[in-house]
Structure formats: C-alpha cells, structure tokens
Amino acid sequence: MTFFDKQGKAINKNGLEAVQRIDYSRPISDAPIHRGFDQFFGTVSCPTTDWLYAFIEGDRIPVPPTGIIDREPLPNHPYSRDNRPGMIAPGYDLEEIDLVFLEKSRAFLKEHSKRSPDKPFFLFHSTQAVHLPSFAADTFKGKTKAGPHGDFIFELDYVVGELMKALDKHGLADNTLVILTSDNGPEVPTVISMRNDHDHDGARPWRGVKRDNWEGGH
C-alpha cells in the first residue's frame, strides 16, 4: 500500500477520493515494522482527527474503511473541534480509542514478561488524549467538574496509571525507565475555553500555548 499516486505525488489534495483509491490488500511498504519496530498498532495520523479512521496492525490495515464518518452523533462542544471528514472502518469508535491503545500496550507488557522478562524493551505508547477533539470514553464522561476536556485529562491520567500498574504487576517496574512527554503546549482554543469556563490553565506555570516560542508552547 502507498500514500502516493502513480506520478509519485502525495495523496493529500483531492479530498476523500484519494483515500478511496487505496488498495488495502497491499502492505504498507514503509510501516514502522520496516523501520526498526518489532510490532506496531496505531493509525496513520491523529486517530480522531484526520481522514483515515482505521487501525494499522503491523504493515496492514486489517479492517479497511468502508464509509464516511458520521459526525452528527459525536460530542459537540468547544473542545470537539479538529475532527475532519474522512473514511472510517467498521467498529472504529472515536470515543474509545485510548482504551483500545491501552489494552494493546497492556497485552504487550504481559507477553513480554512471559517470554523474556530480563530482556530490555522499548514501548512507545501514543495517546490521543489530550489532543483535540476531546472525546473522553463513556467511562470518564462527567468524572470531573472541568467539562469534557477535564474528563479527557482524567482519562489520560487513568491510562498512565494503568500502564504503571501493568509494569508493576508483571515485575517490570523496577528496571524500566518511564518518560511522559508531549510534542507541544496546550492548544489555543482549549486554553481560552478552559480559562474562561473552569479557571484552568493547561500550561501553568509556564508562559505561552501551542505555537509560541515560550516554554509553555512548542
């Protein structure tokens, strides 16, 4: 499978027609498993934001997208922006993405502890939380007094906590370095809404927000 057309140009300027032309029976030639990773489970880009709503496993998309995403039933609030039209696979639930990722990582840790507990491993776990849109799973809706985005932050805390518990459960915690990081500061509209609605500043005590050169930005 490739994301380039016959002329070698990236398929990114023709709406959904280009996505509909993808041959999902073919492998992804430049997938992470061909770039040093033993296993991969994830998405092409942000899992609740961009065009192709389907999971990649290894170098394949086992359940290809077959329809257009229906955004009508999705949450509609100041933190639900950044969710674009796109092709979606059957059973792909935008509000449960992080719990799917969590189960995959827990399964990896369990399997590693059985097969080679003394062998070093590298697990790169990318959450959707707390990137917009803030689609907290049903389990976490209303868990905080800070609205949908606060619930999404709560879900991220839960995911991190569950991964830490898994390390401890499988005897991996004492010899594992855990790094929690972000690629940038909080999104501008999110910060504005959270400040106005809940007196919460996602970058506090640092200056700036996403796209700023200050320590709270990029």
Region annotations inferred by a language model:
Residues 1-87:
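Catalytic-site neighborhoods of secreted/periplasmic enzymes
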Residues 50-60, 105-152, 187, 193-196:
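Active-site His/acidic residue clusters
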Residues 86-99, 142-155:
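The substrate-binding groove and active-site-proximal loops of carbohydrate-active enzymes
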Residues 10-23, 89-123:
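Catalytic-adjacent loop/helix segments of enzymes that bind and process anionic phosphate/sulfate esters
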Residues 104-105, 156-165:
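Short, well-ordered amphipathic alpha-helical segments that serve as non-catalytic structural scaffolds
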Residues 18-25, 32-33, 132-135, 139-152, ...:
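Histidine-centered active-site microenvironments of extracellular/periplasmic hydrolases
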